[in-house]
Amino acid sequence: MRVERHGHSCVVVRATSTLVVDPGVWSDVSAALDSADAVLVTHEHPDHLAVEPVVASGLPVWGPAPVVDLLAAAGAARDRLHQVCGGDLITPSGITVRVLGEWHELIHADAPRFANVGYLVDDRVLHPGDAYVAIPDGVPVELACVPVSGPWLRISDVVDWVRQVRPACVVPVHDALASQRGVELALTWVERLCDVDVIRSGEVDLGGG
């Protein structure tokens, strides 16, 4: 299994088939969707979902209800859209994926809340979207995608979440809102306080299928 970063929150997971998670407008969407078999979207914000390219791809898409509605309104075929919620177990293109969580992290008490789900791919790779999703007990996550910037994020919360998930390694996501120095500072704290390997390269090979 290989995991590739394609900018901001977009990650490609290549195993027996290829899944794209969160191809948003701040990502290299065309490269991410090329040769993909399915798309997983955590929530409807444009930095996680570039509507027009995803619709044009014709790929099957899994996501919470607002994502499905947004894509359908833009012309996506309904039979290619699959609504999910936390607790679901799905098999896009033959890969087992657990759907986790329910809500986007709070930005402000006066701001609206948004649906958000995380995806745990093959019990190995975790993408939380914009939330600190809980994982099932006893699941040894190999790689967690860790948000490092955003209006809803504090590095202390990130550290606590990584400690709870206890992945073998992490890759940074949700980084377009920070400078490179800011991203590196966040990763330094995660590395220092979580006893975890931080992968700074664009891709990582986890081995196996």
Give names to the regions the model predicted.
Residues 15-17, 34-36, 56-60, 76-78, ...:
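Short glycine/proline-enriched coil/turn segments at helix->beta-strand junctions
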Residues 48-50, 154, 180:
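Conserved alpha/beta-hydrolase "acid-adjacent" motif
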Residues 21-22, 40-41, 98-102, 146, ...:
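Redox-cofactor binding/interface segments in oxidoreductases and associated redox assembly factors
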Residues 1-4, 75-93, 138, 159, ...:
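Binuclear metal-ion centers of metallo-dependent hydrolases, dominated by the metallo-beta-lactamase
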Residues 25-70, 141-145, 166:
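Active-site metal-binding motif and surrounding structural segment of the metallo-beta-lactamase
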Residues 143-163:
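Active-site-proximal segments of metal-dependent phosphoesterases and phosphodiesterases across multiple
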Residues 45, 67, 103, 132, ...:
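Catalytic metal-binding/acid-base residues of hydrolase active sites
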Residues 1-34, 83-140, 152-154, 202-209:
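Core dinuclear metal-dependent hydrolase active-site scaffold
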